[in-house]
């Protein structure tokens, strides 16, 4: 059982999806996950339902202390998910694959991810690295509460692998809430915005909001792009696709 979108994807990708007896409420990929009972998520695990399903192993977040205590009392083993950066994806796949009895397939998957990311790194290695602001959230229709990737973590690692220079690389946090004044001071040459749902009528208006920061190089040169898909925020097997999408946006000439 997995309560975490990333590890649920990993288990399916390594060929262990048929072993799952339950999944997290926010687990949406692959489509086969929809057949599974939903047992809550980080803040609201349905502990009674989890125990009723009698899993042999539960993948949990490190902060789910109450759930882990109940699992221990029921003699149900758990695997604690830890994720800080890009290398943790392969490490988690290898260790989780060993726990569920598909080590060979898990190692093959991890090798494929590592080689895929390295292929993209090599492709953009000689290109100038534009100063990039990677935004993963803000208030719709405004430039308030701009949530951006800081200088550590999964998003930062993806951006660096894609050939961008994180404009917040000196801030040793995974995320930074920025004001427009901070964006002006950092002067990014490229702005990448991550979007998660289907396209809607507000997307174009959201892009236009940046025009008020005309002094920012990315705005002046119209180097602002929206990148869409959950693969950008779920640190799992689709990370190679996410890194390549970033790289193609930052360095289109490298993929011609």
Predicted regions and their residues:
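A short, structured surface patch at a secondary-structure boundary
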Residues: 1-53, 57-67, 164-167, 195, ...
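Short, structured coil segments at secondary-structure junctions
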Residues: 16, 35, 74-76, 162, ...
């Amino acid at each position: 059982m997995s309560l975490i979108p990333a590890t649920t994807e990993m288990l399916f990708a390594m060929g262990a999806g048929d072993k799952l007896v339950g999944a997290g409420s926010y687990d949406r990929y692959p489509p086969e996950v929809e057949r599974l009972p939903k047992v809550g998520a980080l803040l609201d695990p349905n502990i009674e339902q989890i125990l009723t399903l009698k899993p042999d192993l539960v993948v949990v977040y490190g902060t789910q202390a109450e759930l882990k205590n109940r699992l221990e009392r029921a003699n149900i083993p758990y695997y604690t998910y830890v994720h800080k950066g890009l290398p943790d994806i392969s490490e988690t796949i290898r260790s989780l694959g060993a726990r569920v009895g598909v080590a060979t397939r898990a190692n093959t998957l991890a090798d494929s991810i590592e080689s895929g990311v390295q292929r993209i790194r090599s492709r953009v290695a000689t290109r100038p690295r534009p100063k990039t602001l990677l935004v993963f959230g803000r208030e719709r229709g405004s430039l308030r509460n701009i949530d951006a990737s800081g200088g550590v973590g999964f998003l930062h690692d993806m951006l660096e692998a894609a050939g961008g220079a994180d404009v917040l690389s000196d801030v040793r946090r995974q995320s930074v809430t920025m004001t427009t004044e901070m964006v002006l001071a950092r002067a990014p040459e490229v702005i990448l915005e991550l979007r998660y749902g289907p396209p809607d009528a507000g997307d174009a208006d959201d892009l236009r909001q940046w025009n008020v920061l005309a002094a920012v190089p990315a705005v002046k040169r119209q180097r602002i792009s929206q990148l869409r898909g959950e693969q950008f925020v779920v640190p799992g097997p689709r990370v190679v696709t996410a890194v390549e999408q970033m790289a193609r946006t930052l360095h289109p000439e490298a993929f011609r």
